[in-house]
Amino acid sequence: MKIFLDTANLESIKKFNDMGLLDGITTNPSLMSKEKGNPKDAMEEITKIIKGDVSLEVVSTDFSGMVDEGKRLRQYGDNVVVKVPMTPDGLKACKSLSSEGIPVNVTLVFSPNQALLAAKSGAKYVSPFIGRLDDIGQDGMNLIQDIKDIFKNYPHLKTEILVASVRHPMHVVEAAKIGADVVTLPPGVLDKMLQHPLTKIGLENFLKDWEKVKAENPDIKI
C-alpha cells in the first residue's frame, strides 16, 4: 500500500520523505491556507521534493473553470494529479482532463455509487473520506471494503482507492488489511505510527546494558 502525506507543510514533507516513507502528497485549499507564504511557491516546491504523485486541488466549481485550473496546476510538474470534487461538473472535468492525459483524483467521495461513477469518468484516484463518515456514526472502513469489492469485479477499471480523512493509525491498518491502494495521512498520524512504548523501553534497556559493557571494557570500540 502506498503512503501519501496529507499536508502542504514543507517541513513535514521533507522530514518523512527523508525516511523514505512517502509515495506522494495530497493537498487541498484548507491545508494550503494553514501555511505561510505564497501557495504557488509551496506547490512548486512540493512537486520538486516528491517524485511521486502530488494532488493539487482546484477551487473552481464549474466545468470550464475546473478544466482551465487543472491545466494550470499540471504545469507545476508532470507528477501533478488534479484534484476535483465529486460533483457532476467535477466528473465532467475529470473526463475532459483524463482524456488529455492529465491524471485526476476525485475527492469528497462518501458512497460506493460515487466511487463507481468517478472510476467510470476516468479518475486515476478516488478519495473516500472515512473519518468524516465515522463522525456521523457510520463505519468508514465499510465504504472502503465496498469500493474494493466493486472494483474487483471490473478489472478494466484502473482507478486506485486513496483512503482519505484518516484519523488514527488503526485506520491505516484496516485499510491495508482490506487492500486499499493508497492511504493519505496527516503528519500527526504518521508520527504515531512510528512510535510504540515498548520500542522506547527496549532501546533504553539496550543502551543501559551497553554502558555496563563499556564500563568493564573501556577500550572497546564498535
Swiss-Prot record:
Predominant subcellular localization, coarse grouping: cytoplasm
Record function comment: Transaldolase is important for the balance of metabolites in the pentose-phosphate pathway.
Name this protein carries in UniProt: Probable transaldolase
One annotated Gene Ontology cellular component of this protein: cytoplasm
**PANTHER family, per the entry:** FRUCTOSE-6-PHOSPHATE ALDOLASE 1-RELATED, TRANSALDOLASE
Family assignment from sequence similarity: Belongs to the transaldolase family. Type 3B subfamily.
Q: What is the lineage of its organism?
A: Archaea, Nitrososphaerota, Nitrososphaeria, Nitrosopumilales, Nitrosopumilaceae
Active-site residues are K83
Q: Which InterPro entries match?
A: Aldolase_TIM (IPR013785), TAL/FSA (IPR001585), Transaldolase_3B (IPR022999), Transaldolase_3B/F6P_aldolase (IPR004731), Transaldolase_AS (IPR018225), TSA/FSA_arc/bac (IPR033919)
What are its E.C. numbers?
A: 2.2.1.2
Organism, per UniProt? Nitrosopumilus maritimus (strain SCM1)
> Which EC class does it fall in?
transferase
Q: Where in the cell is it found?
A: Cytoplasm
Q: Which GO terms describe its molecular function?
A: aldehyde-lyase activity; transaldolase activity
Reaction catalysed by this enzyme: D-sedoheptulose 7-phosphate + D-glyceraldehyde 3-phosphate = D-erythrose 4-phosphate + beta-D-fructose 6-phosphate
Which biological process terms from the Gene Ontology are attached to this UniProt entry? carbohydrate metabolic process; pentose-phosphate shunt
The pathway is: Carbohydrate degradation; pentose phosphate pathway; D-glyceraldehyde 3-phosphate and beta-D-fructose 6-phosphate from D-ribose 5-phosphate and D-xylulose 5-phosphate (non-oxidative stage): step 2/3
Q: Which UniProt keywords apply?
A: Cytoplasm, Pentose shunt, Schiff base, Transferase
Pfam family, any one: TAL_FSA
